Each structure stands twice: as structure tokens, then as C-alpha cells.
Amino acid sequence: MMKRNILAVIVPALLVAGTANAAEIYNKDGNKVDLYGKAVGLHYFSKGNGENSYGGNGDMTYARLGFKGETQINSDLTGYGQWEYNFQGNNSEGADAQTGNKTRLAFAGLKYADVGSFDYGRNYGVVYDALGYTDMLPEFGGDTAYSDDFFVGRVGGVATYRNSNFFGLVDGLNFAVQYLGKNERDTARRSNGDGVGGSISYEYEGFGIVGAYGAADRTNLQEAQPLGNGKKAEQWATGLKYDANNIYLAANYGETRNATPITNKFTNTSGFANKTQDVLLVAQYQFDFGLRPSIAYTKSKAKDVEGIGDVDLVNYFEVGATYYFNKNMSTYVDYIINQIDSDNKLGVGSDDTVAVGIVYQF
């Protein structure tokens, strides 16, 4: 019974913070370094070769490694940094050995008492403060939180100010302001101009509410794409959650303008949706003996796509479950029941996908 009760406490912490189970490797004279990581044996199952499916088919094994460090400069001022890297384990040792390997996070900053923290580097965009509420599925999810896409996911060149508990005056009231520097890359998909975003959230006794918004200039290369118009990209999202008594419920609604990447597989043209409307729902329950079932629904619809009109980008129901043997070892299955029509005008895959994984994390 004691083991079951411990799992009921530890598992939600692991889901919210990927470093909650980190191994402390140094702690001396006000300097602390924690190492964290995981190895995931993972396989996707879809019809045929998976080209017309939600998630593909075959081996998807990967590992991640990261560290978090902090140094106590004085009684009020603390320095900190974090780095995280992804290693694909489904590559050969030949020419494709480095395919998919990437830096996920790399930033450093300072925190001063109740005034807040300021950091710079590769970090999460502030709109993910809202989208993170529903990015909780065993394997899938987070479909609208694209990386290197302005403010909705991990992105480079962001300066972020965060304040917790409103200068120490209101417990649970948090806000953030973020500046996104210009990233003019070789591909329009992962480029962006200068922009500013912000978020505000309030949490009380398991309930949470959040709103976030970001707007940025688009690069010349993005404006030249055949799909998507406008000089500005905008993204916003709201979220509600309940996280208490072993229950997790969350919902997001958001919209984007000239910001969500799309590709027409029939014409081989790419660009951005002029507008999207996104709905994400998730419900989970943590049993004391380690089982955590999950159900979810996600729909992202593009509006006014050139030559097409309105079209679904993502549309599915999810059923899955994770079983935690202890705080370090788990296994899961995640099933996407795809609701995309077989005649989708962008050629988005309409077949289902099942993921089966086993995880060691520390």
C-alpha cells in the first residue's frame, strides 16, 4: 500500500516536470547540478508503410539527456541554466547516424528574489504556457505546439522574463513576457521575424486558468511562400485544467494567423495557414497501483487556404495508458483514432496509429 501511495504522488510530478526525477551530481558551496534523461524503446504501428497515417510506422526509439544547474550568487540572486539534447536510436551507424539528433533546450539566466527571472537562449515560447496543459498524452499530443514556429513550442533566440506569485504578493498568479529575436533560416518553415509575446496564469487548489499571446514579423522568405499571406504572424491560446485527487482534466482553445505550417502533398507547395482554430481536450486518472489511463480529443482546422478553403490539419480521438513500475520505469500504449477524411484536400494522412513504448528515466 505504501508503494501505491508513493506512486500516486510521484507520477503527476514526473508528468508536469520532466526533471522532477533528476539525479543530483553536484551540490557544494551554493552550486548545484542535476542530470536527467530517459531512454525510450518505441515502435509505431500503422497500415502499410505508414505514409498515409497519423504518425508513421516502424522503430521510433530515442534517448534524451539534459542538465539543470544553478549557482547562489548572494542571498537574493541566483544564476541558472539548462540544456537538453535528443538522440535518435532508430538510425543506422552509417550516413543517417545523426538524422533527428538535435538540441531541444539551451538557455541561461538570473533570478532575483520575488522580482522574477530573466533568461536567454533556446527555450519554450510563451504560448506553450497554455498549450502545455493538454500536452500530457503517453506518446502523442502537442500537435499545435510546433517547434521553431514563433511562440507555440521550443524556439531559439528568446529572451524571457517570468514572475511567480506576482512578486510574492498573490500565490498562484504568474505571468511572463517574451521577446523573440529574428531567426532567418534556409527554410521558411523554421524562420521568424522579431516579435513579442506574453502569458498570464492563475492556479488555486488544483484548478488552473491560462491565457497567452504572441505576435511577430514574418520574414521575406515566408511572405514569398505560395500558401499564406500577411506580414505578421499571430498565435494565441487559452487553457483550463484541474489537477488534484489523482484526476487530470485539461482543455485548450487557440487560434493562429499566418503562423501554422502546412503542405499540400498533391501540388507539393508549402507555406502557412491564413488562420487556424484549435481545440484540445484531455482526461487522465492516476491509480495508486501505477496505471494512468488517458483519453483525448484534438482538432486543428485551417481556414481560407488558397485554392482549397477550410481543411482539417489534425483531427483524432486518443485512447492510451501508462503503467509506472516505479519512478524510474514505465511502459505505455497510445492509440490515435484518426478522424481525417480520406479525401483530405491537403493529403493529410487518414489512417490510425498505435504506439507502444517502454521507458527508463532518471
From Swiss-Prot:
Name of the molecule in the record: Outer membrane porin F
Reported phenotype of the disruption mutant: Leads to decreased susceptibility to a number of hydrophilic antibiotics including ampicillin, cefoxitin and tetracycline. Deletion of ompF confers resistance to colicin E5.
Entry keyword annotation includes Membrane: yes
GO CC annotation, single: cell outer membrane
Listed transmembrane segments: 23-28, 30-45, 61-73, 76-88, 105-113, 116-122, 157-163, 172-181, 194-204, 206-217, 233-244, 246-257, 275-287, 290-303, 314-325, 328-337, 353-362
Coiled coil: none
Stretches assigned to the Extracellular side: 46-60, 89-104, 123-156, 182-193, 218-232, 258-274, 304-313, 338-352
Entry comment, domain topic: Each subunit of the trimer has a water-filled pore with a narrow, elliptically shaped (7 X 11 Angstroms) selectivity filter which has a solvent accessible area of 30-40 Angstroms(2).
Signal peptide: 1-22
GO biological process: monoatomic ion transmembrane transport; protein homotrimerization; protein transport
Organism: Escherichia coli (strain K12)
Segments in the Periplasmic topological domain: 29, 74-75, 114-115, 164-171, 205, 245, 288-289, 326-327
Keyword line: Cell outer membrane, Ion transport, Membrane, Porin, Protein transport, Signal, Transmembrane, Transmembrane beta strand, Transport
